[in-house]
Swiss-Prot record:
GO molecular function, one term: monoatomic cation:bicarbonate symporter activity
Protein name: Zinc transporter ZIP12
Record's keyword terms, sorted: Ion transport, Membrane, Transmembrane, Transmembrane helix, Transport, Zinc, Zinc transport
Membrane topology (Extracellular): 1-202, 391-398, 470-538, 624-631, 685-691
Membrane topology: Multi-pass membrane protein
Record's function text: Uniporter that promotes Zn(2+) import from the extracellular space to the cytoplasm across the cell membrane. The transport activity is temperature dependent. May play a role in neurulation and neurite extension. May play a key role in maintaining intracellular zinc content at levels that reduce the inhibitory effects of rises in oxidative stress on spermatogonia and spermatozoa viability during spermatogenesis.
Catalytic activity: Zn(2+)(in) = Zn(2+)(out)
Cellular localization per UniProt: Membrane
Amino acid sequence: MCFRTKLSVSWVPLFLLLSRVFSTETDKPSAQDSRSRGSSGQPADLLQVLSAGDHPPHNHSRSLIKTLLEKTGCPRRRNGMQGDCNLCFEPDALLLIAGGNFEDQLREEVVQRVSLLLLYYIIHQEEICSSKLNMSNKEYKFYLHSLLSLRQDEDSSFLSQNETEDILAFTRQYFDTSQSQCMETKTLQKKSGIVSSEGANESTLPQLAAMIITLSLQGVCLGQGNLPSPDYFTEYIFSSLNRTNTLRLSELDQLLNTLWTRSTCIKNEKIHQFQRKQNNIITHDQDYSNFSSSMEKESEDGPVSWDQTCFSARQLVEIFLQKGLSLISKEDFKQMSPGIIQQLLSCSCHLPKDQQAKLPPTTLEKYGYSTVAVTLLTLGSMLGTALVLFHSCEENYRLILQLFVGLAVGTLSGDALLHLIPQVLGLHKQEAPEFGHFHESKGHIWKLMGLIGGIHGFFLIEKCFILLVSPNDKQGLSLVNGHVGHSHHLALNSELSDQAGRGKSASTIQLKSPEDSQAAEMPIGSMTASNRKCKAISLLAIMILVGDSLHNFADGLAIGAAFSSSSESGVTTTIAILCHEIPHEMGDFAVLLSSGLSMKTAILMNFISSLTAFMGLYIGLSVSADPCVQDWIFTVTAGMFLYLSLVEMLPEMTHVQTQRPWMMFLLQNFGLILGWLSLLLLAIYEQNIKI
């Protein structure tokens, strides 16, 4: 009966899908063709290879195994010569070792086991054919473990990458396969259903063996060839941008800028740089709708020359893909490649050295710079605790604290408004690095400075109203009216150090507030009351420690995302957080001391809570490789900065009172202006920062 009529019903669909007949006696396909056909290494694939030819075997187990052994044991030699085929192994013995019988139909498991035995035969053919090794005397498990233990110095439970390469090297020499382009080992393992990074195990090795035998009989080169596969280049480009299967437009822009930055153009001088003004490298989303009409217009010098036009990433997508795509697949990228090469050859987008885009930070730079930044942040927080030690003059302490509070408000709100929010909205990417276009490309910065001016203006009005209208008898008060929720609002009592130094009870160490003053005058009650007070104080210290730890964790997360984006973003975010941490830690340290803790214990707890910033940092670095994740972290960070600066700290600056109100007013404004000015300069010149 015909071979195809004896197939089981379950194999019929596989044969319908594999309608193209392969022949090992004709021209051999390339690795690229094999990938496009998507051979799965299933029994149907192997049997179809055996069925090719003038006299396909019947679906009889013994006949099929004999044909397979002949094709494997006697592969076609070079120059089309076919020598005598002397099989060193009987088909019946091969079938019995694999667990099969002489029935008419081969099972999938048997075909895979036979393939594994054939791999062993190929590797040890010399010993087998010289009668030094008799395969009939061993069971299947022996050959399975022998292949898994191909290298004695590696794990015998898995077929490692090196062991797989060794096997493929044998097959390339054994079969007549092309050495120019080969299917890579990782691709072969993936097609064989191997997902573990350690390699094939006892259950998946037979599948891999069937795939190797099938593709080798089809003439496909496997493993490391003389030349890489065509997919290697696309995969390298995508992996360099931390992507796997798709690119975003922003990442394609980054790739184009990198290519234009590194390219050395030798071009006729009549191609002028001002041509780029007609069509900027980075196309604004709001201007994209006018692209077609603008390119059809004639310039003053005549029609627009495509040879001198610099196309943006979005325009290349429109030209080649004829549709607006937010994600670009590997096939789409291959289709666009001629346009990218043309842009490099024409030098239309070549940038001067002082305008070249900076490359994204490497992994070493991200982890190195961010670790240094968080270390400085930790030391800065300890500086805040050191300032508390000079609290003998309470009035001077309060003035210094308000100076840092003003600086924190300026840097936090400035970083959120001038850097984080524009970056989330993509305004940084729309800046055109053109001479004479400074005010146009930085226009959003001046508008945001107007917003900051409005905040500062109303702060001045309210502060002046309080200073000029409030009764003079209230100027001597030193409490923050109604603000007890944040640690910045707390001031030390002038007797704090003396009391702590003498080891007085916690009930006598109080913050300067009316309720606390009354409590300070009360004698220490019974032991029960004292114990209750100690429990309350311990709870307060724990709350401060937990809250400070979460706060520092969020700071580390923000710094990690910032340095993942760019070194400039990391610097600006670090400065903003550092200016905020000093007054924050001063307040927290004051609360810990006032709760009855000793100086050493308070410093230790403050230091331990600051270490959570490193935890947040490395989590932020690991999860923010995706630009989308970076944007969301920046969004939340901007909201946190605005809340801390405008909701928590700015009202404190408005209502705090002192014996020298005008001095405090000047110091607060000095801190505000210094913080905003620093972030303004960073927003303007951040591209010039070189680390």
